[in-house]
């Protein structure tokens, strides 16, 4: 049982080791304040190991298959005790470790511009990332995050910094068996920091004002096992102090 994920996980001693063949291509560019980076990749994974949620009906079918195998190997064995109570998982979702060949294809990129402003540096950037993961015999790999668009503004000056980031996360409807979809959301975060000399300049205090999920969106991380029960934190505003001496 794994209480943190709400799963009753069933292992398999016959699982093989994964074998992966990967290709990654990365490009970088920077000139006169303009910058860009891009990566494309493909991962070909043989015997990819994953955790698959299953319904009680599917579990009963698996139990019957294993039960029949046990009868073949143990003729005459009394079968009343072997499976009694095995359908009681304490309210946890039953999950089996499975194995299939899979392909992961995707890309990520960021481009932007930096300018000098009021004795400091301000940068504007836009980025996007995306992964498409499918099994070679059909169907999607579970718990794969959807496409994201990321917009950010950063400013830095000696002893001072500020940032504003908006992440537009798309819905995820490319689902594995018994997997639930997640809706799109916008996550807006802000942070402002000021460094203050202390102890006659021998130390430093960093004061940071931050605000996360300013729009107070109901957001769910698709790769989380508990996304349906536990969304990401709502609006969160705080003040943080860090001292160095």
Feature locations, PLM:
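Outer-membrane beta-barrel transmembrane strands
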Residues: 16-30, 35, 100-105, 142, ...
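Transmembrane beta-barrel architecture of outer-membrane proteins
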Residues: 10, 20-24, 95-97, 102-110, ...
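Gram-negative outer-membrane beta-barrel transporters
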Residues: 41-45, 56, 62-63, 68, ...
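Residues on the lipid-exposed face of transmembrane beta-strands in outer-membrane beta-barrel proteins
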Residues: 25-29, 107-113, 151-155, 164, ...
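Outer-membrane beta-barrel domain signature
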Residues: 12-16, 96-100, 136-142, 177-181, ...
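Outer-membrane beta-barrel channels and translocator barrels
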Residues: 20, 30-34, 114-119, 156-160, ...
């Amino acid at each position: 049982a794994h209480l943190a994920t709400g799963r009753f996980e069933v292992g398999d001693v016959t699982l093989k080791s994964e074998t992966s063949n990967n290709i990654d291509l990365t490009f970088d560019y920077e000139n006169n304040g303009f910058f860009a980076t891009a990566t494309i990749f493909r991962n070909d994974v043989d015997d990819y190991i994953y955790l698959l949620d299953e319904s009680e009906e599917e579990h009963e079918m698996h139990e019957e298959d294993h039960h029949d195998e046990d009868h073949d190997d143990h003729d005459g064995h009394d079968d009343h005790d072997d499976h009694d109570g095995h359908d009681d998982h304490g309210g946890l979702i039953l999950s089996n470790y499975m194995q299939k060949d899979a392909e992961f294809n995707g890309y990520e990129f960021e481009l932007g511009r930096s300018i000098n402003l009021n004795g400091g540096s301000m940068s504007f950037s836009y980025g996007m990332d995306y992964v498409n993961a499918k099994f070679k015999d059909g169907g999607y790999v579970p718990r794969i995050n959807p496409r994201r668009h990321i917009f950010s503004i950063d400013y830095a000056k000696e002893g001072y910094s500020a940032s504003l980031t908006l992440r537009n996360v798309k819905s995820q409807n490319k689902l594995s068996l018994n997997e639930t979809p997640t809706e799109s959301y916008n996550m807006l975060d802000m942070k402002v920091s000021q460094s203050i000399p202390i102890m006659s300049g021998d130390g430093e205090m960093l004061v940071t004002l931050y605000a996360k999920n300013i729009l107070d969106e109901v957001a769910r991380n698709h790769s989380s096992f508990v996304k349906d029960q536990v969304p990401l934190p709502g609006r969160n505003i705080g003040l943080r102090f860090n001292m160095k001496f």
